[in-house]
């Protein structure tokens, strides 16, 4: 509610601005559900009469809502959270409704949305609706378009969704700290016409990066470039879920980038089209085939392909240091350097010391003690041995016979006989 004094003084919390909720209004707030598991949740099925393909958030979930007098109401709680990045490592982050990133918000073009934001952080915050067309006073820039949301207070944002597409939300208050601590989420607006841009499977995730020293839990928020944890929805491989897909499905993957660098996102085994950008959908006549799409800072991209090639297809950022985990950074290159004598001497002081890198960086067969709360540089085991990946890596698993609404991991692909690379033992050609 806007006080008479604030209204008359033009404080920015007036009729078209994000407004403070009164005590009476707070009593009727919609529920603010929370999620603690890091597993990808089944898509939130739309109500009858509003047909669209709901999104599956990679290692995340969609926020439930309620309808009240023609408004679709959501409730976000900005709060400290603990996020498991992968088994063996957790981070103390800030997020929404129990997780970082926060839950995906889904609505339909033309919907009137009312989003309550309760601040349980130790400092003020706001929420900016990245890429959306809305009244200026709802844009969420603290000090410019609205007052900041103080700790313990609830503000409300109200606007009508003018266009469908892929958007994000994040603070515009103490932005360096709050975004570095994980405060972000996806906002998906589905077309009002169910025949527009229809797909069978629709995935979404946000890329974020953190600098967390081994043995610690809280990111270094002043870091600008030298991050050691590169995540998809605040998860790193082998903690990132697979993307299960039915053979023959038309598949969309939406990607948002709120790190401090660009990411060339590469899919094995397929050509895809970039069908959507920050500004909207791309007409079919303006698209071209790609296997790698570069996603710059602050951008959203949507790619589509038809899943007509069954298998387990790698899907990852093509910057190799973005597919490594925390222990793999700032290591000198020792390829070609004999280390046997050095290792013996160091072992007298450090019994668990293991020489690394004299023949390359492979770690598939190595085991060594790690500091508390960190991850090996490369990890994961596949059907043929060590995967040696980390960070921004997952697998698109295309399968015959997968159920229409089945998003469970189908396990490893069973290759038809004679279709796997094998050791050659014959005579080599001259």
Explain the meaning of each model-derived region.
Residues 2-430:
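Copper-binding active sites and cupredoxin-like electron-transfer domains
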């Amino acid at each position: 509610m806007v006080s008479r004094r604030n209204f008359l003084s033009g404080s920015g919390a007036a009729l078209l601005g994000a407004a403070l909720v009164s005590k009476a209004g707070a009593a009727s707030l919609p529920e603010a559900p929370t999620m603690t598991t890091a597993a990808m949740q089944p898509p939130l099925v739309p109500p009858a009469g509003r047909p669209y393909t709901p999104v599956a958030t990679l290692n995340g979930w969609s926020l439930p809502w309620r309808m009240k007098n023609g408004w679709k109401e959501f409730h976000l709680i900005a709060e400290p959270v603990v996020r498991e990045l992968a088994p063996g490592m957790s981070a103390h982050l800030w997020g929404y409704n129990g997780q970082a990133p926060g839950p995906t918000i889904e609505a339909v073009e033309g919907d009137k949305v009312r989003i309550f934001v309760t601040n349980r952080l130790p400092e003020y915050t706001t929420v900016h609706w990245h890429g959306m067309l809305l009244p200026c006073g709802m844009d969420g820039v603290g000090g410019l378009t609205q007052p900041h949301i103080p700790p313990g207070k609830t503000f409300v944002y109200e606007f009508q969704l003018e266009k469908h597409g892929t958007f994000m939300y994040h603070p515009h208050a103490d932005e360096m700290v709050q975004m570095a601590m994980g405060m972000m989420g996806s906002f998906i607006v589905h077309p009002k016409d169910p025949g527009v841009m229809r797909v069978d499977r629709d995935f979404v995730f946000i890329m974020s990066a953190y600098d967390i020293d081994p043995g610690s839990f809280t990111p270094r928020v002043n870091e600008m470039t030298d991050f050691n944890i590169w995540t998809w929805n605040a998860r790193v491989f082998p903690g990132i879920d697979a993307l299960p897909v039915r053979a023959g499905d038309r598949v969309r993957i939406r990607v948002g980038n709120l790190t401090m660098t660009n990411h060339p996102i590469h899919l094995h085994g397929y050509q895809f089209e970039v069908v959507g950008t920050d500004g909207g959908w791309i007409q079919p006549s303006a698209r071209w085939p790609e296997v790698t799409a570069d996603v710059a800072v602050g951008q959203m991209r949507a790619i589509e392909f038809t899943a007509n090639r069954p298998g387990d297809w790698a899907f990852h950022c093509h910057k190799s240091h973005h597919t490594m985990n925390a222990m793999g950074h700032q290591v000198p290159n020792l390829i070609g350097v004999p280390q046997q004598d050095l290792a013996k001497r160091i072992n007298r002081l450090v019994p668990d010391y293991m020489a690394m890198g004299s023949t390359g960086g492979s770690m598939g067969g190595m085991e060594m003690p790690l500091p508390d709360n960190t991850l090996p540089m490369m990890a994961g085991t596949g059907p043929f041995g060590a995967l040696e990946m980390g960070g921004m890596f997952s697998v698109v698993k295309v399968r015959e016979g997968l159920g229409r609404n089945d998003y469970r991991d189908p396990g490893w692909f069973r290759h038809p006989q004679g279709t796997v690379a094998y050791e050659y033992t014959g005579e080599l050609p001259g």
